[in-house]
Amino acid sequence: MSELRFPEEKPLLRGQDTEMESADTFMSAADTDWKEHDIETPYGMLHVVIRGTPKGNRPAILTYHDVGLNHKLCFNTFFNYEDMQEITKHFVVCHVDAPGQQVGASQFPQGYQYPTMEQLAAMLPSVMQHFGFQSIIGIGVGAGAYVFAKFALIFPELVEGMVLINIDPNGKGWIDWAASKLSGLTSSLPETVLSHLFSQEELMNNTELVQNYRQQISSCVNQSNLQLFWNMYNSRRDLEMSRPGTVPNAKTLRAPVMLVVGDNAPAEDSVVECNSKLDPTNTTFLKMADSGGLPQVTQPGKLTEAFKYFLQGMGYMPSASMTRLARSRTASLTSASSVDGARPRPCTQSESSDGIGQINHTMEVSC
């Protein structure tokens, strides 16, 4: 098991005395370079925002948010983080909003059938075709991570890599369904969604972060549309994946994957289980210390460093600075696979960078 440690040399968030930027700030962060599009797909319209233009054969970075959020609530803090600009200048970035979840979305008419999770995944090729993307690197959180995993299983040739945060590969059984229904009867929809996004400790402490998201989920996401998305996510099926060699004709994600979860996140056990279903030769497991349910919001600096390292492992950005990444050589390798295992792209990180070369084995990362 390889371990990476990330010492902080500057605050993760601009306001050192707050857990997150004010609600007004993170909802109205500079969006002048972003262009909005409504794209027709086989299962309805998708609202997306895009910055940059496709750069040759380089993949686009495509994001998909969690249930209860939209691209702004989920990703603004991460993509506005200072060090993230070094990455985004090399890629076109496209944020996808699940149907009806964007700010100002019209309410769906009564009787509207919300797309299934499989159909949400099947809408993404229309986005790629619209912009001329040849391939993508996906960043998904929660429900968005599930959508990207399903997309990669259906269209593996379109995916070069994925960062899956808080993914739950399991469907909901009837007991889970009943518990969800009971929760809906005793709690408001925003409170039910908050229990999905945050740990019980975070909710009990009623942190400023939780308070901000409670307000934004209630005011910035159409509640009727959110209920439809929430119901569909809780009707999802198992992602039919198995680690190669464990069952005959095992099917799993072929592209490099970085799994991310906070060590105090409600999705921790689910992400650990997902890791057991993936190919150890191209999977990195990042468990973020002192982080709850939204590591991309509370720990954007650490996640940016890990993402930069992940991209370098795919052969991109070989000269990108890694000034805040300290690598520990004291941890042991746990994967049975050789470090000479193949990746779709050669890793360009050299031994001179503190001695870590190719990352061709499963790593568990603590930071």
Curated annotation (Swiss-Prot):
One of its GO terms (biological process) is positive regulation of ERK1 and ERK2 cascade. It is found in: Cytoplasm, Cytosol. One of its GO terms (cellular component) is cytosol. The keyword Cytoplasm applies. Its main location: cytoplasm. Residues 347-367 have a biased composition (Polar residues). Keywords: Cytoplasm. Belongs to the NDRG family. Contributes to the maintenance of intracerebral BDNF levels within the normal range. May enhance growth factor-induced ERK1 and ERK2 phosphorylation. May attenuate growth factor-promoted ELK1 phosphorylation in a microtubule-dependent manner. This is Protein NDRG4-B. It comes from Xenopus laevis (African clawed frog).
